[in-house]
Amino acid sequence: MRDNVVNELINLAKNDKDIVLLTGDLGFGVFEKFESSFPGQYFNVGVAEQNMIGLATGLALEGKKVVTYSIGNFGILRCLEQIRNDACYHDANITIIANGGGFSYGSLGMSHHTTEDIAILRSLPNISVVAPCTADEAGEAITSMIMNGGTGYLRLDKSSPKDCSSEDLFVIGKSRRYKEGKDITLIATGSILGEANIASVELKKFGIQARVVGMHSIKPIDADEIIDAVSNTGGIVTIEEHNKDGGLGSAVSEVCMDLGIKPNKFLRIGLDNQYSSIVGGQQYLRSKYNMDSKAIINKIKKIFKL
């Protein structure tokens, strides 16, 4: 995902000198071409995330289109006050990129497990929250976020699912359908969409036709797609590599409650309200915390009493 984002940034910066990239002393391998091509538009601020957001806000208020980059929790939790008071309060044109959503850096332990970010940031006014489901979406997302203006959070995974394609246009605030089905709708955000896709294929063996939706835009969220899932399928299952409290499942629930609609079946799949203290690779941790395709299948079979 990261490579696609950087390639898009390079293409955009060729025609727009106002695009500025700030990094918190990370990403050198992929930023070399950007730095050499646009030396006046690239700054390594060091391991100083609070200063990075402050600098980004100042540049944005002077008309620059700023992108900040760090990994996982570093570019969010270390500088949450600055994101709130500087960037969001001033509705500054800053796209905050965090590479390594969910368990992407699983082997580095809970300090690098990014599992509360969506819940925290979507509660702030004046910020969009986007978690691309595929590498192609990541490239489309950075372009849309910069062009739309305002403060945005772009959550990237280190992995990207294979065999996931949609003909729907990428629009912030709209989702994409990857498979059609009438019995249940699987709504996923981020690269864990791949697990939902695999599960949908296996569920056919049990007579369950699952619609698969990639909800890359969590804020603003696609309420129309949620309404359609409630009206035209047998229920909703949300799937996220994130704490269930405050994440995608909560956002979908809020839409249903606000609109007074009730899915026939409803299930949230994600991390329970706990710290992921186990160390391991992304796929291992998905399995350990019951959010891989096998766990998705078993949980859906259970709600269908199979």
Model-inferred region functions:
Residues M1-L306:
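Thiamine diphosphate
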